[in-house]
Curated annotation (Swiss-Prot):
Residues 346-397 are annotated as: Disordered. It comes from Mus musculus (Mouse). Pfam families: DUF4702. PANTHER family: COILED-COIL DOMAIN-CONTAINING PROTEIN 116. This is Coiled-coil domain-containing protein 116. It is found in: Cytoplasm, Cytoskeleton, Microtubule organizing center, Centrosome. One of its GO terms (cellular component) is cytoplasm. Keywords: Coiled coil, Cytoplasm, Cytoskeleton, Phosphoprotein.
Length: 541
């Protein structure tokens, strides 16, 4: 039985190319064209009567015969075989060096080269020293040892490769050359060489810009980790393994070529490297406290308060907010829409806030000199009336709100009151007839006495209230008529105060020049009055 095969050099290629279906040859050739055509490189197939067997044999012959050869070419181009060979040799050396407790080698390895066999010609593996001595050093481009006349190698070499010189020593008296086991001249791939050269050029330019900082940092990290790899950068000769090939010197660029920002970055990197090296060289470990998730927030707050970092953080946040608020787009419009600085409407249960928080708000704004914003809350006459009824019979201790304000007494006359105040005062009684009757009844008892104006200044700057009161000593809750609307020094619209003022603690007036500070407890109905067409306003002091 004759077989016609195309010898590609690889055994796997030959087995893949050979078909399992072999047609029986006739005893006599009827025609000269039916003779075996081994030289033509194809397998003749006789016509078969079975269609299924013919289709199956065609599928088997359709298999690509150069798949394994291309895979081997890939392994040689990527230096995978070289790496595997190195690993195997190192493992062999370690096994050969291992010894038992008695000092006997664990594995007895005899080199067939040194001790040849007398029965047959020795074609064994050379010694490890010989392999290391004759192995070529790694170059920029991986070589392709064409130990077999592969079709894939010859086809690819014909149009994309150039011939290179011999690698290593290939003398006839050497072990590799004499036995014919040495590698043939490799064929370097032109595209791969150009790719590696471009990459090396980028590394060279990057090394020039960073002024060896990258090499120092990498060498420092590798040294700290105890690694002795050959791929790490060195301080003495950065990129020296290809600088000679490219014709560039590894000299550092002068400082004049670098900008101020680059010099500062280089200085910071060098400083960081020194600090890291000093920390790694410490013989003792770091004395750090144990981490506790329950105590950590408190420790952080204590640390911030101890080093006074809260004001610094506040300044940083304020600067960031200022920059963002003043940022503008290309068309001139602000990046963020700036709203009015008024405090938004608080819910109706805002009186449940703690008095300390309410008292601290005007004090902080007064210290910073910011204008006080108008505090407007939702108001319901029914709820205020219920609260006032409940508070009348309760002792003074039930009152929760307390603050300090100044009273300034200024002698005024009813005739000197501006017309706007009377106009504003006429609107409120018309809207509430019951409150008007109460106001008239309360003022009849004090109409014979001369009137003085109580100049009430709230803790927040910019708000002044003038209240008409009677001369003498005021005791208990007394209702008074407003003489003028509140005087505002702000541009925001501010609703008028109601004409009733309930003071829960007695106080005495003083001469007009004095400003005594009086502590007063005001109920929830203090300064509450719905205004016609203006909404409502509730202010708790």
């Amino acid at each position: 039985m004759a077989r016609c095969r195309h010898h590609s050099g690889y055994l796997a290629d030959d087995e893949a190319a050979h078909s399992t279906y072999v047609a029986p040859l006739p005893k006599k050739h009827l025609l000269p064209e039916m003779r075996p055509t081994c030289k033509l490189g194809r397998v003749p197939h006789l016509p078969s009567m079975n269609q299924y067997s013919e289709h199956q044999s065609h599928q088997q012959n359709f298999r690509h015969p150069l798949a394994f050869g291309g895979f081997l070419d890939f392994l040689t181009e990527g230096q995978v075989l070289d790496s595997l060979q190195t690993v195997v040799e190192q493992a062999t050396e370690r096994l050969a060096a291992m010894k038992t407790e008695a000092g006997v080698p664990l594995v007895d390895i005899q080199d067939p080269v040194e001790v040849p066999s007398s029965r047959h010609r020795s074609r064994a593996r050379p010694s490890i020293d010989t392999v290391h001595r004759h192995r070529a050093r790694p170059t920029l481009c991986a070589g392709r040892p064409n130990n077999y006349p592969s079709c894939s190698s010859s086809m690819s070499d014909s149009h994309s490769s150039i011939t290179a010189g011999w690698l290593g020593s290939h003398s006839q008296d050497s072990d590799l050359g004499a036995r014919g086991i040495g590698s043939l001249p490799p064929m370097r791939d032109k595209l791969l060489l150009e790719k590696n050269l471009k990459r090396l050029l980028r590394l060279e330019n990057k090394g020039k810009i960073l002024n060896q900082s990258c090499s120092q940092r990498d060498s420092l990290l590798w040294d700290s980790l105890g690694s002795q790899t050959s791929s790490q950068w060195t301080r003495e000769q950065p990129l020296s393994w290809f600088s000679g090939l490219l014709g560039s010197s590894p000299a550092t660029p002068e400082t004049s070529e670098l900008g101020l920002g680059e010099q500062e970055m280089i200085f910071l990197k060098q400083k960081l490297n020194k600090e890291m090296k000093s920390l790694l060289n410490q013989p003792r470990p770091f004395n750090l406290p144990t981490y506790c998730p329950l105590r950590e927030p408190h420790h952080t707050l204590d640390f911030l308060a101890k080093h006074r970092l809260f004001p610094a953080l506040q300044r940083v946040v304020s600067q960031a907010v200022d920059k963002l608020s003043h940022a503008c787009r290309h068309n001139g419009f602000p990046l963020f829409p700036v709203t009015s600085e008024t405090i938004p409407d608080l819910p109706g249960n805002s009186d449940l806030l703690q008095p300390s928080s309410k008292a601290s708000i005007p004090t902080n704004r007064e210290a910073r000199g910011e204008p006080c914003d108008s505090l407007t809350t939702a108001y319901s006459p029914k709820t205020s009336h219920r609260k006032s009824k409940g508070r009348r019979g309760s002792p003074p201790n039930a009152v929760q709100m307390a603050t300090r304000f100044r009273l300034k007494v200024t002698p005024t006359q009813v005739s000197n009151v501006p017309i706007s105040s009377f106009h504003s005062m006429q609107e409120a009684p018309n809207s509430e007839p019951k409150l008007q009757k109460q106001a008239m009844a309360s003022n009849c008892n004090h109409i014979s006495q001369p009137c003085h104006g109580l100049h009430l200044t709230l803790p927040a700057p910019g708000i002044t209230v003038e209240v008409a009161s009677c001369q003498g000593r005021l005791r208990g809750p007394v209702q008074h008529r407003l003489a003028s609307p509140c005087c505002l020094h702000s541009h925001f619209p501010f609703p008028l105060f109601p004409p009733f003022l309930s003071l829960g603690k007695s106080f005495s007036t003083s001469p007009p020049t004095l400003h005594p500070e009086v502590t007063s407890r005001a109920g929830l109905e203090v300064l509450e009055q719905p205004l016609k067409g203006r909404g409502s306003f509730t202010h708790h002091f």
